[in-house]
Amino acid sequence: MRPSESLVETLRIQALSAPSTSGVYLWKDVHGVVIYVGKAKSLRTRLTSYFRCRHDPKTRVLMSRAAALEYLQTQHEYEALLLENTLIKKHTPRYNICLKDGKTYPLLKLTCEPFPRIFRTRQFCQDGARYFGPFPDVQILDSFLKLILRTYKIRTCTTLRKRKNPCLYYHLKRCDAPCCGWVSPRTYQKDIHEITLLLEGNIDATVARLEKRMKRAVRQEAFEAAARIRDDIQAIRCITHKSLVQDMDERARDYIAWSSTGAIVTFAVLRMRGGKLNGRELFRTRSLKNEEEILSEFLITYYSDHTIPPHLFVHSSAGLAEHWLSHKAGTQCTVTLIPLHTFPTPQTPSSTVTTNAPTLAASQNSNAVQDSGLRSCSETSTMHTLQKAHDACTASEGTRENTPHESAHTPHHRAILAMAQLNAHEDITRYLKNRGADDALKELQKQLHLARIPTLIEGFDISHLGGKYTVASLICFKNGAPDTKNYRLFNLRAHDTRIDDFASMREAIARRYTHTPEGYTLPDLILVDGGIGHVSAAQHVLDALGLSIPLVGLAKRAEELFIPNSPTPLVLDRRNPALHMLQRIRDEAHRFAITRNRHLRTKKELVLSFERLPHVGKVRAHRLLAHFGSFRSLQSATPQDIATAIHIPLTQAHTILHAATRSTTAPVREEYKEHEHDPQGESPGPGRKTD
């Protein structure tokens, strides 16, 4: 069963809005079941690749079943690997082949013996030993382990037996022979302590020492030794990275953070179970209460239907809800308060947010976010429940205990809590952006008196340089977002000898709408960059084709809107969201046209530079351009390279190279004075730069 076009478009827009950072993504079917889990170095690049035409059979089947998309942004690709492994083992998706077995990423185990040893393992046991990891890259882990065993004289034997003579490792100076009693436990433990500090992240001294050795090896031209030391430094830095999605703390715990702007509040819940990030939920609602009341109400509402963990981490006071949690759970629920930096409130849908929290974020399908709140929970009933819980706890426990605050593991918990807070903040930012686009389209419908909301808008712009290299750009916006796969460019050669913006606009409109592909949907609105002259030219073509598509022109100088058959332009307030939407479309069309225009000019200048060389005509100039890409690359080439590129004798290649190296003509100019169409239909003056 093929998904509907509207569903595919919704998923594609979600993919386009994904961040260009590493993370994990989940495809779900119509029943909400996870059918595929993947990780990506760039979420946006990876997700948008699913909507291209060419795919292998497996991917085509996957996309035919996909109905929802969810993604989680991570700080490092390393964490994406760990989280992918956890989620695959949790959901066992149908279309995942690897990582579905019980095999996990390896750990480093430091035993608790009198003379401990360190080794790689895949099993975690409650045996008193210390475990570090997991580590997705086994090769880097083995490199790090070899470095440890080279640097510190730690035993590698499985069983420590008393011996009269040490083994070969002692003679290789790789072991202090504790089996012979030649090293005291105290001296041995000093090395173990240094290894522990290294695994806990105290790497500055070790890395500095290795960097000195590497530089000394480079000065002595011992490059192989320097490369090995470089790999050791890289292994240390990778191994000691602290993961926020997996740790060795097996306690069940929840991290709850929230972010708000105005009356809109989003809560993010991260669930850690067995030392792994086991789940993430986002809930959006509206509230005008203070911080303590907002969090208390959410905790009571959420944990009325969910299991209460023994440990809960929040970034603001939970108030009376702390007692209610312990009373409902029947056991002590420890609520730890860890203050965080607050996020700046998003002011506009397109505002850029700068935070002090770690750059580890999560994004979720908006369908999974409960926009209307968790449940219908009135203020009166909530406060009554809080007071009742407080009375019950006071009667059974006496005075209220203080909320636990700082601890030795607070930095790690604060980082996870900051991740939850960033999840909540990004949900609000995304919600405001989507709501802003909807409001702008509705306002646009109102101002232009359109029959329906213009969900599909196509914009045109003309760009040229004094009448040369004339191009027209066509860009498409769907639901207020760019639809880049439907962008088009037109090389307008019919008017390449004179400046005629109106004729260029007529040609672009005609070429777009004369022969439309099968299944093509006409836009709800056409926007042209220009004044009444450009609008009239476009309308003339639409009338000739028998198309009744709403048309509007946006002039740059006064930001006036020109409508066909309207005697006066429409002037909107500079703060009007409809005007902002049209400006965004106009500017995108302008950018797209300018980029193509510059490309044509640069290519022409390069071809002319090659044509000035001896034995080079137009055909050979294009071949040289395709092979070398620039005049500078040609100058640094060999005669053999030139002869091979354009199939000429070696003597001619020597002549071409000699002329190129002696050439004083600038092959490419990066700055140009660009004479484009004027927004009001007037020709630009000499030397005027209009982009």
Curated annotation (Swiss-Prot):
Main location: cytoplasm
Start and end residues of each GIY-YIG domain: 20-97
Matching SUPFAM superfamilies: C-terminal UvrC-binding domain of UvrB, GIY-YIG endonuclease, RuvA domain 2-like
Gene3D superfamilies: 5' to 3' exonuclease, C-terminal subdomain (1.10.150.20), GIY-YIG endonuclease (3.40.1440.10), UVR domain (4.10.860.10), UvrC, RNAse H endonuclease domain (3.30.420.340)
CDD domains: GIY-YIG_UvrC_Cho (cd10434)
UniProt keyword Transport present: no
This protein's UniProt keywords: Cytoplasm, DNA damage, DNA excision, DNA repair, Excision nuclease, SOS response
Region Disordered, annotated ranges: 662-691
Listed Basic and acidic residues bias regions: 668-680
Subcellular location: Cytoplasm
One of the GO biological process terms: SOS response
Signal peptide: none
GO cellular component, one term: cytoplasm
Single Gene Ontology MF annotation: excinuclease ABC activity
PROSITE patterns: GIY_YIG (PS50164), UVR (PS50151), UVRC (PS50165)
Record's keyword annotation contains Acetylation: no
Domain (UVR): residue spans on this chain: 204-239
Summary of subunit composition and partner proteins: Interacts with UvrB in an incision complex.
HAMAP family registered for this protein in UniProt: UvrC
NCBIfam families registered for this protein in UniProt: PRK14672.1, uvrC
The family this protein is said to belong to: Belongs to the UvrC family.
Function summary: The UvrABC repair system catalyzes the recognition and processing of DNA lesions. UvrC both incises the 5' and 3' sides of the lesion. The N-terminal half is responsible for the 3' incision and the C-terminal half is responsible for the 5' incision.
The name this protein goes by in its record: UvrABC system protein C
Species for this entry: Treponema pallidum (strain Nichols)
Lineage, top ranks: Bacteria, Pseudomonadati, Spirochaetota, Spirochaetia, Spirochaetales
